[in-house]
Amino acid sequence: MAETLFWTPLLVVLLAGLGDTEAQQTTLHPLVGRVFVHTLDHETFLSLPEHVAVPPAVHITYHAHLQGHPDLPRWLRYTQRSPHHPGFLYGSATPEDRGLQVIEVTAYNRDSFDTTRQRLVLEIGDPEGPLLPYQAEFLVRSHDAEEVLPSTPASRFLSALGGLWEPGELQLLNVTSALDRGGRVPLPIEGRKEGVYIKVGSASPFSTCLKMVASPDSHARCAQGQPPLLSCYDTLAPHFRVDWCNVTLVDKSVPEPADEVPTPGDGILEHDPFFCPPTEAPDRDFLVDALVTLLVPLLVALLLTLLLAYVMCCRREGRLKRDLATSDIQMVHHCTIHGNTEELRQMAASREVPRPLSTLPMFNVHTGERLPPRVDSAQVPLILDQH
C-alpha cells in the first residue's frame, strides 16, 4: 500500500511533464540563395504570461535536428553563445534543398529540468525579384557570428557597405563563422573575436574600389605584409573591422561555358603513328610446355640420385680389400702403435706414487711434521713453536 502511495504522485508528475512537452509548430519560408535566420528566444519556450520578463538567471539550451535524422541538414547551422543567450538557426539553402523540411527543436531548462519541443516547418522556395549575379564576401574580424545574425547589425553592415558599392539594393546571402572556415579559436582576452564571413549580393556591378581591393596586385601586397590597395574611404570602420586582404568577388553575370558532353564513337581509332595496336595472337596449347617444365627437372634429379647411390653403395672398396692392398710392414707398424698405446694406458692406471706432503691434511710446511688423521684437532695449538 505504501509503494502505491509513492508511485501514484510520481506518475502524475511524469504525465504532467509529458503534457508540457507537446510540440509547438511554426511555419517559415526560407529562400534559395538568401540567408535564413531564426532566433530561438527563451520567451517562446518558457510560455510566460504577457508582460512578464524572462528571469535573467534562467539557463536554457537547445538541440535541433532534421525530423527523422540525428543532425541538421547540411545548409543549416546552429549556434548559441551561452545558456543565457538565445540560440540561432541560420544558413543559406541551395537549389537541391528546395521543398519541405521539418526541424525539431528541443529546449532544456537547466534550472527546473523542464523540456519543451518546437517543430519548425521550412517551406524552401525560390526568391522573387532580380537575380544577384555580383557577389562579394568579406571577413569581419570584429564580430562573432551570433552578433551579426540579428537584423539590426546586418542592416547596419549593408548600409555601411553601400558607400563602397554602386547604388543598388544589397542583400545578405550568407553568414559563416570563421571557425567553420578553419579559423582559430581566439584567446580569452577582451576584444578578441572569432570572426565571421559575410556574403553580400547585388544586381549592380562592383565598384572600382572593390575591384582594386580584389586585384592580384592588392593580393601581392598582402602577401608581402603591406596594406591592400584601398582607393576609397572605408565606410565600414570603425563599427566593422574588415580584413581587406580576404575579400572575394564573384561575377556570375557571364554564364559559364557548359561542359562538353562526350559523344560515344564507333570504337575505331583513327590512324595514329604513335599507337601500335597489338597483333592477333593465335591460340596456343601450353600442355607440352608444362610437361617439359615439370618432367625435365624431375628426370635430372632422378639420374643424379641413381648416380649418387651407385657411387656410395657399389664403388666401396671394403675393409678386406683395403687390408690386402696394404703392405705387411705398414700393417705391423699400425698394429704396433695401437699396442704401445694400450700398454701405456695400463701402466698409467696401475702406478702407485705417494701424494705430495703439501696436499696431506694437517701438514706443517715449516716443521715438516704430520699429525695422524685421528688426532684431536682441538688440542693442537693454533701457532706451533718455531725451532
UniProtKB/Swiss-Prot annotation:
Stretches assigned to the Cytoplasmic side: 312-387
Which SMART domains does the record associate with it?
Answer: CADG
Can you say where in the cell this protein is located?
Cell membrane, Sarcolemma; Cytoplasm, Cytoskeleton
Could you state a single Gene Ontology molecular function term? Answer: calcium ion binding
Stretches in topological domain Extracellular: 24-290
> What is the top-level taxon of the source organism?
Eukaryota
Q: Where are the transmembrane segments?
A: 291-311
Residues annotated as signal peptide: 1-23
Membrane topology term: Single-pass type I membrane protein
Record keywords: Cell membrane, Cytoplasm, Cytoskeleton, Disease variant, Glycoprotein, Limb-girdle muscular dystrophy, Membrane, Phosphoprotein, Signal, Transmembrane, Transmembrane helix
Q: Which Pfam families match?
A: Sarcoglycan_2 (PF05510), Sarcoglycan_2_C (PF20989)
Q: Which residues are modified by glycosylation? A: 174, 246
Is Ion transport among the key words of this record?
A: no
What pairs make up the disulfide bonds?
none
Which residues are annotated with the PTM Phosphoserine? Answer: 377
Q: In which tissues is it expressed?
A: Most strongly expressed in skeletal muscle. Also expressed in cardiac muscle and, at much lower levels, in lung. In the fetus, most abundant in cardiac muscle and, at lower levels, in lung. Also detected in liver and kidney. Not expressed in brain.
Q: Which GO terms describe its cellular component?
A: cell-cell junction; cytoskeleton; dystrophin-associated glycoprotein complex; endoplasmic reticulum membrane; Golgi membrane; membrane raft; plasma membrane; sarcoglycan complex
The biological process GO terms on file are: muscle contraction; muscle organ development
Has UniProt tagged this entry with the keyword Glycoprotein?
Answer: yes
Protein family membership: Belongs to the sarcoglycan alpha/epsilon family.
Known function: Component of the sarcoglycan complex, a subcomplex of the dystrophin-glycoprotein complex which forms a link between the F-actin cytoskeleton and the extracellular matrix.
* Reported disease: Muscular dystrophy, limb-girdle, autosomal recessive 3: An autosomal recessive degenerative myopathy characterized by progressive muscle wasting from early childhood with loss of independent ambulation by teenage years. Muscle biopsy shows necrosis, decreased immunostaining for alpha sarcoglycan, and adhalin deficiency.
Q: How does it assemble?
A: Interacts with the syntrophin SNTA1. Cross-link to form 2 major subcomplexes: one consisting of SGCB, SGCD and SGCG and the other consisting of SGCB and SGCD. The association between SGCB and SGCG is particularly strong while SGCA is loosely associated with the other sarcoglycans.
Q: What is the name attached to this protein's record?
A: Alpha-sarcoglycan
Q: What is the protein's species of origin? A: Homo sapiens (Human)
> Upper taxonomic classification of the species?
Eukaryota, Metazoa, Chordata, Craniata, Vertebrata
